[in-house]
């Protein structure tokens, strides 16, 4: 089974955009938090990240909670920012998208392990 995946895109030398996809069958078991925390820790400790951010659709409650559990702050929400799906008539369905972010110094404060 594939539980999910986490990924990071390097925006510049010290800034990364992160994201994840997880199989709904494994929700609520802590896998997403463990995997995402591992990714953030790697980026801050090994890859030289200073800032990490991610985009989350406003109605994706689980991903928003995950960002908050990771210590990321909500920095804003873009109205009708992006679309990944279509409406029933085939037209693009634009979704409100929030930005969550965390700095290395914040991560070091909350992740003392």
Where on the chain are the PLM-derived regions?
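Acyl-donor (CoA/ACP) binding surface of acyl/acetyltransferases
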Residues: 1-113
